Each structure stands twice: as C-alpha cells, then as structure tokens.
Amino acid sequence: GSKKFITRATTADWLMVVARLDQGEKFIGLLVPREAPGVHISAEVGKLGWFGVPISSLTFSDVRIPVTHRLGEEGDGFSLAQDALLRARIGHAAMALGRAIGAVEIAAAYACERNTFGKPLSTQQGVQWMLADMVTQIEASRALLYTTAQKYDHGEADTATFASMAKLHATDLCMKVVTDALQLTGG
C-alpha cells in the first residue's frame, strides 16, 4: 500500500502505521523500522509553510513485521490513529498561537520604535485598539488551548470537540493577527 503526506518519514527511524489485517475490518497499529525491506520513502515534498517538518510519501511492498511490533491489540489501530490526530490538533493550535504571539510582539515593538507625526506610533489610539484586540484574542485562544490540554490529560469525553475548536480558533486568530501585524509594520 501507499500513503501520501507523511510527516517526518525522511527523518524517522521508526514509522507508526495503522493498517487492516488480511482485508478484515479491524485496524492494527504497527511500529515499522524505516530500513525494513519493502519500505520506500519518497523525497521530501515542497509546501507553502511548516518548513521545519519534512513531508514525503510512503510505499510498502511485501513488508513483513513481527508480532512484537504491534501496538496494542488487534482492533486498536483506529483508536491509536484518532488519538494521534487529536494530539496533532492540539499541537497545531499551540503552533498557531505561538506564531500569533510572535507577530504581536514584533508589531508592538515596531509601534513603540516607529515615530509618526513626531511621536511613537504606539501612542495612536487606533494602533492601541488594534494591539489590544490582538492580545485579547490571543489570551482567549490561550485559555481555550489550556482547557483543551487539561481535558486531554484527564481523558474527558469532549476533548475531541475542544481540540477541534482550539485548532480552528488559533489558526483563524493567527491569520488575523499576522495580517494586522503586517498592517502595523507597514506591510
């Protein structure tokens, strides 16, 4: 089989794979060594962002893995994959929040340094409103992210819903804050 858009396959020593067993309905989780015969990893794929994480494709041809490499029990593969996606949503929310924080820090520093009409840009009321809105939204996103992480840590039933909300809010916020920061810094 094959799979596209695999993160870190070119740098990983082991691959976590979720697969079906003998055309059955149950999924299993496996740890596959990258050097196993039949494992083929493509060159890295270019992308528009997230440059620190290599993306590539995987192809498996008659790969044999010992039963000791199985994660959990037969049928646990789907829940393992769901948990990985859940953790990824929380991680993406955190990364987007970090980018937004960085953008507002740069914009605020610039607004304090840049003089317009004989005084710092940061003294302009419209700029203050813009920065205040950016920080307020960042803190709201941070609170949602912390709540989500706490729910994950405690295994609460609504964690997936909160993880999706946190990712949505943080990524939308990141786009807005970065766009506003560009406006404040002259673009």
What are these regions (language model features)?
Residues 35-66:
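Flexible, small-/acidic-enriched active-site or ligand-binding loops
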Residues 2-41:
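A short core secondary-structure module
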Residues 8-12, 51-53, 72:
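Short glycine/proline-enriched turns and hinge-like loops at secondary-structure junctions
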Residues 3, 49-50, 89, 167:
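Active-site PLP-lysine loop of aminotransferase-like
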Residues 3, 51-54, 74, 79, ...:
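Gly/Ser/Thr-rich beta-alpha loop segments that engage phosphate groups in nucleotides
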Residues 59, 83-187:
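Alpha-helical interface subdomain recognition
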Residues 56-83:
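A short, charged helix-loop
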